[in-house]
Amino acid sequence: MATVTAALVKELRERTAAGMMDCKKALVEADGDIELAIDNMRKSGAAKAAKKSGNIAAEGTIIIKEVDGIAAILEVNCQTDFVAKDASFLAFANEVADAALAGRVEVAELQAAFEEKRIALVTKIGENISIRRVEFIEGAQIGSYRHGDRIGVVVVVVASDADQETIKQVAMHVAASKPEFVTPEDVPADVVAKEKQIQIDIAIQSGKPAEIAEKMVVGRMKKFTGEVSLTGQAFIMDPAQTVGQMLKAKGATVTNFIRFEVGEGIEKAKEMSFAEEVAAVQKG
């Protein structure tokens, strides 16, 4: 049996970023053959990653990258907020975002290109990691804002007088107020029709005649389309005016925006209470 030296363990650690004991064990099992040890560790890592893939990854980070009028916004997920702050995890997410922007690479291609590195990271960290989504936005004036690592916004503004601070404030507003559309006119007809019927039913159930209910709903629908659209919302920096009014005063128009929030739309596993955990342990 070959001698496993400290130098071999050190080299394997540098090449794989695995723990010292894992490296020593792999070298012993490979009889000191470092290349075989690496192959075995990769196979073992893939198996571990496959087992972890069923775990819900609803924490993570939002990364924004921008160059030459194009911005990429990316979500990479993990299982806990502790790992979401891990340097290795964040380095991985930034590397993926750089690659996405450089080649305008869609998510399926990114997932394939980074699968080997993802598996290595899962093995190192011990949590499921997933490249969830990426979107791109173009424009001469792009503003962005990240609220911590959990919320990211990019906006495209066509402006004559709006400075970068104003554009950033619009991005901050999107982060805080969660508009779904740019203007009230952008709200799809099916969304408007569905909400209108709900409001009519509410009015009728309150005892109003159908013709009166129809008239009441007109005002409610104007309020609804304003609340779900960026330009119709009260500007968080100055609630006395809407975002649309502020932009008009600046000679500016928002043409598009994207808002990502970590874990939105992912159904998280129900957390067990202490009593439930004890009961589960007793059941074996």
Swiss-Prot record:
Chain segments carrying region Involved in Mg(2+) ion dislocation from EF-Tu: 80-83
CDD domains, A to Z: UBA_EF-Ts
GO molecular function: translation elongation factor activity
Domain of life: Bacteria
GO cellular component, as recorded: cytoplasm
Keywords: Cytoplasm, Elongation factor, Protein biosynthesis
Intracellular or extracellular location(s): Cytoplasm
Family designation: Belongs to the EF-Ts family.
HAMAP family documented for this protein: EF_Ts
Protein name: Elongation factor Ts
Organism per entry: Photobacterium profundum (strain SS9)
